[in-house]
Amino acid sequence: SEHWQLFNNNEVLFNEARTAQAATVVFSLQQNAQIEPLARSIHTLRRQRGSAMKILVRENTASLRATDERLLLACGANMVIPWNAPLSRCLTMIESVQGQKFSRYVPEDITTLLSMTQPLKLRGFQKWDVFCNAVNNMMNNPLLPAHGKGVLVALRPVPGIRVEQALTLCRPNRTGDIMTIGGNRLVLFLSCLLYTS
């Protein structure tokens, strides 16, 4: 369409959007590592460009947790389009925000939002004491919803497989997913995951 413009990446899109007023901006989310930089870009645009701009995030692979989505929305995104939405649904969702004004409050300081929604900065194998301390801190964080702090899973390997061997099969790619070994079990903590997920 003559009304659409495609950009090479989110950074180029962000720089172009900094001069727009009531444009519709659709960021692309490819991987979990993009969440914080994308949140910062969204926060900046919303604070600088105001409520007429429509800011959407199109998730291209399953990489968002509920807290990640809450962060993007709290930073000023109008909507997050899930990775499994077909193109026709995606276009309908983009169309649905046209004419809307963003009405939610966006705090001036993004660090409050980041610390509230992304409190655990660890990933992968942790020593037992570090693991226990991290899980305890998450469970006692009053800023996270009670049902969304995380899920703790203890796995016992099948006979003939040592727990250390099972550990080599775990490759978490999300910050906040940690694991340890204890009591001949592989213990995983998937942070900020809803029980229903």
Residue ranges and their predicted role:
Residues 2-21, 32-35, 133-138:
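A short, well-structured beta->alpha microelement
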Residues 17-49, 58:
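Conserved phosphotransfer microenvironments
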Residues 85-93:
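C-terminal output helix
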Residues 102-141, 147:
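CheY-like receiver
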Residues 133-162, 184:
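Catalytic-site or vestigial catalytic-site microsegments of nucleotide-handling domains
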Residues 181-192:
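Short beta-strand->loop micro-motif that forms the acidic, two-metal-ion catalytic signature
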